[in-house]
Amino acid sequence: MSIRIIPQDELGSSEKRTADMIPPLLFPRLKNVYNRRAERLRELAENNPLGDYLRFAALIAHAQEVVLYDHPLEMDLTARIKEANDQGKPPLDIHVLPRDKHWQKLLHSLIAELKPEMNGPALAVIENLEKASEQELEQMASALFASDFASVSSDKAPFIWAALSLYWAQMASLIPGKARAEYGEARQYCPVCGSMPVSSMVQIDTTQGLRYLHCNLCETEWHVVRVKCSNCEQSRDLHYWSLENEQAAVKAESCGDCGTYLKILYQEKDPKVEAVADDLASLVLDARMEQEGFARSSINPFLFPGEGE
């Protein structure tokens, strides 16, 4: 199954009703998303061996919230949606969508917001980014989108990605239209931008019991049925791992067919779980999965692979 975004004026009345039954896509609702992430990161930092880094990530998330409202984005994406729909491509495809200078404005605002909170190596990193040329910043952005992580140091990547993520999330929140699920290409990548998931979540409320993958870039969530590998769509050899017990709110879903795993979070076990924060706070589970021979099929926006990984 794949997910395609249909312009609003091309949806018939029956399709509109169907699209409202099980939403294939949940576009980002940006109000307080970064503050909630920052709060969860600070909460999870207590008694966590990674506490210092979780608090560092919380500072970036809080800065994203501030910059989001300081630099709103106005953009008409109607033509872009129709063009992408005709081409069968994600409307905000990271591999083809031209970037304007808005994202660099966001980056410099993030740096200004974070400088008073940083010291030592972290301060040196953002000061280095502050001095980088527009061309150098674009090269780093292109490398990250191409998964060329060896070309961008792992200490710079979270700051670059934080600005790109803000930009793409702002655009995704402005998309006009509905989404429709249809048979086609596998959907292990975000249908809006083509980036990777950070984790998946079994939700409560109006989407009770449904699993959605959460994009690590544009914050969109897309529906993938449970008990199916989100990477290869097989269901023959799935296993669920946790560091606690069967009632754990954070588990890893491994697939013996493709040899990968993805975290799955359960809101019914803990309503406060957050896609990015809880994934980052459970790196001990990642270490266990690596010991078992599984490769991660996702990337956390605060933890990028280094050279040689």
Curated annotation (Swiss-Prot):
Keyword vocabulary terms for this entry: Cytoplasm
Task of the protein: Necessary for formate dehydrogenase activity.
Record-linked HAMAP family: FdeH
InterPro entries: FdhE-like_sf, FdhE_C, FdhE_central, FdhE_N, Formate_DH_accessory
Subcellular location, principal: cytoplasm
Subcellular location: Cytoplasm
One GO term describing the cellular component: cytosol
Keyword Zinc: no
Example GO biological process: protein maturation
Source lineage: Bacteria, Pseudomonadati, Pseudomonadota, Gammaproteobacteria, Enterobacterales
Protein name in the entry: Protein FdhE
Similarity field: Belongs to the FdhE family.
